[in-house]
């Protein structure tokens, strides 16, 4: 959240720092920019994770699509380019993995126009996922429920 708030340029490139995405594919996001596009979101061509993460990621995305009518395929693909001016209109509050959903839903509510491109997904090179730790799962679930109440699709 602080990075979004501190940004000064017209566009914000947002990705993970664990090496699961190739930053050189940013040029592919840039090629999708038009005056009418507000966010270019990547979606994983082939998720390079273990079977449990693949199944849970698939299920999570399907559930979110059913509940929120999300305008993109892969809400948790942290490889996106976002028009900075949109952040003047929204305030991100989530402190868990729900921030991706909150970002997409609030941008959708503001009328943002989305574009998508496939991106490569690689094995994690740095750090460990904290997503499956019980406190994180509970926090994300709690924040997702709050979002469902606050931001109906």
Language model features: what each stretch is:
Residues 1-6, 11, 23-97, 124-147:
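Acceptor/aglycone-binding surface of glycosyltransferases and processive sugar-polymer synthases
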Residues 21, 99-106:
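Short active-site alpha-helical segment characteristic of glycosyltransferases
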Residues 71, 92-95, 104-122:
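Catalytic donor-sugar/metal-binding loop of nucleotide-sugar-dependent glycosyltransferases
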Residues 152-153:
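Short, charged juxtamembrane terminal tails flanking transmembrane helices
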């Amino acid at each position: 959240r602080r990075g979004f708030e501190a940004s000064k340029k017209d566009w914000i490139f947002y990705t993970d720092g664990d090496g699961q995405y190739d930053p050189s594919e940013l040029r592919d996001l840039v090629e999708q920019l038009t005056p009418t596009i507000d966010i270019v979101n990547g979606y994983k061509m082939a998720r390079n994770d273990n079977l449990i993460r693949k199944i849970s990621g698939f299920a999570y995305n399907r559930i979110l699509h059913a509940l929120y009518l999300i305008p993109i395929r892969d809400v948790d693909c942290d490889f996106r380019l976002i028009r900075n001016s949109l952040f003047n209109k929204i305030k991100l509050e989530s402190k868990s993995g729900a921030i991706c959903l909150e970002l997409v839903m609030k941008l959708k509510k503001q009328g943002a126009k989305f574009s998508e491109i496939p991106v490569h997904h690689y094995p994690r090179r740095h750090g460990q996922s904290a997503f499956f730790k019980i406190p994180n799962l509970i926090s994300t679930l709690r924040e997702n429920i709050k979002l469902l109440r606050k931001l109906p699709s």
